[in-house]
A protein has these predicted regions:
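Phosphate-binding glycine-rich loop
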Residues: 29-77, 83, 91-95, 101-103, ...
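Short beta-strand-to-turn element immediately C-terminal to the catalytic PLP-Schiff-base lysine
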Residues: 179-180, 194-199, 239
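PLP-dependent aminotransferase-like
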Residues: 68-157, 164
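N-terminal "arm"/small-domain region of PLP-dependent enzymes with the aminotransferase-like
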Residues: 1-30, 35, 302, 344
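Conserved active-site segment immediately N-terminal to the catalytic lysine
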Residues: 155-190, 205, 217-222
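Conserved G/P- and acidic residue-centered "switch" motifs that form tight phosphate/ATP-binding loops
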Residues: 59, 96, 156, 186, ...
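PLP-dependent aminotransferase class I/II
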Residues: 8, 35-42, 47-53, 114, ...
């Protein structure tokens, strides 16, 4: 079976270095908050182009802690999209704030900036933009809105490690950037891991404190925090993989280029790419004009496991339905989930698997 993602490939490619890094941690005296985490935080800041990075347990925690650091609380509102991983919205709800869903662009599937300003009011405290599938949002427009209203921007970069907008790395443009190192991601560890980036010293120190019970340097909890840390083992692995992230992303781009030039079926549309974005293709998501479910079944019968990201938007999920405002217009969000399909995309994907995927998609018919 050929899967749309294969985490093991990221290990096999650099197994010798990764095994050595794991062994070094196991024989060290520090498994939590040691030199590997500090090194990775520094390396990642240098890579992204921010002053500070804070390793945390996962991307959901990164967003939650960032919201808390900004001061988001019950009664506040946070604008974001419904077409995202549930964790984006779970982090908002976790603070007691209300997520306000806005629609996405039908072209790029990123946040529709025209809808953002319509939903801003006195309760709006943060806007979370999601760089979905590895593609940047329209950050110029978002930052203009941010400046106009004085609203902080959190970049959800969970799927966009290494991506750029007008030459700048995502995660360095907003107030805070939040990253995931889940095993399927472009930059991945072998468990859960996340990180927040910022240029604001106060936010850096606040996120760091909140991620460790709200402690100050004397272990006196000044705020009610939580326990969310990137451990030494994951950091050691990430230090190895970060060296190769640009190379791995380039491999994804090459696969995407081959798909775009070789898949030629009137029923299938390729993902649009913004001219201002260096797209790193965490996922390659096609749109099927007719027979989407039939296509998925057809691929599976022929040894290819395709996915849907995401089959159920967050506002349709039971726990979050109550947050949908009567005035919310999520037409594009609800439209695209009926047609999108994620086809195989990961560094290490073999040519024979790529070619098989292309051939099967070109042969697909609803007849």
């Amino acid at each position: 079976m050929i899967y749309f993602s294969y985490p093991k490939a990221g290990y096999l490619k650099y197994s010798e270095e990764i095994n050595k890094s794991i062994e070094d941690v196991l024989y060290s005296e520090t498994y939590i908050k040691g030199e590997n985490v500090l090194k990775f935080e520094n390396n990642f800041s240098n890579y992204i182009g921010t002053k500070y990075s804070i390793g945390v347990g996962n991307a959901t925690d990164a967003i939650y802690l960032s919201l808390r650091a900004i001061g988001v609380k019950k009664g506040d509102e946070v604008i974001t999209v419904s077409h995202t991983a549930t964790g984006t919205v779970a982090a908002i709800a976790g603070t007691g704030a209300t997520p306000v869903f806005v629609d996405i662009s039908d072209k790029y599937y990123t946040i529709n900036v025209n809808e953002v300003e319509k939903n801003i009011n006195k309760k709006t405290k943060v806007i979370i933009v999601v760089h979905i599938y590895g593609q940047a949002c329209d950050m110029d427009s978002i930052l203009t809105i941010s400046k106009k209203y004085g609203i902080p921007i959190i970049e959800d970069c969970a799927q966009a490690a290494g991506a750029k907008y007008k030459g700048k790395r995502l995660g360095s443009l907003g107030t805070i950037g939040c990253f995931s190192f889940f095993p399927t991601k472009n930059l991945s560890c072998i468990g859960d891991g996340g990180l927040a980036t910022t240029n604001d010293k106060y936010l850096y120190e606040k996120i760091k404190s909140l991620g460790q019970y709200g402690w100050d340097k004397n272990r006196d909890a000044k705020s009610i925090g939580t326990n969310s840390r990137l451990d030494e083992l994951q950091a050691a692995i990430l230090n190895v993989k970060l060296k190769y992230l640009d190379q791995d992303n380039q491999e994804r781009i090459q696969i995407a280029t081959l798909y775009r030039s070789s898949i030629d079926n009137m029923l299938i549309s390729h993902p649009e790419k913004s001219k201002h974005c260096y797209h790193v293709y965490h996922l390659y998501v096609i749109s099927v004009k007719k027979g989407r479910d039939k296509l998925i079944e057809y691929l599976r019968k022929n040894g290819i496991y395709a996915g849907i990201h995401y089959s159920l938007p967050v506002h349709k999920q039971k726990a979050y339905k109550k947050y949908l405002l009567k005035s919310s217009n999520l037409t594009n969000t609800e439209k695209i989930i009926k047609s999108i399909v994620s086809i195989p995309m990961y560094q290490g994907l073999e040519n024979k698997s790529i070619n098989k995927t292309i051939d099967l998609l070109n042969l697909f018919s609803t007849n």
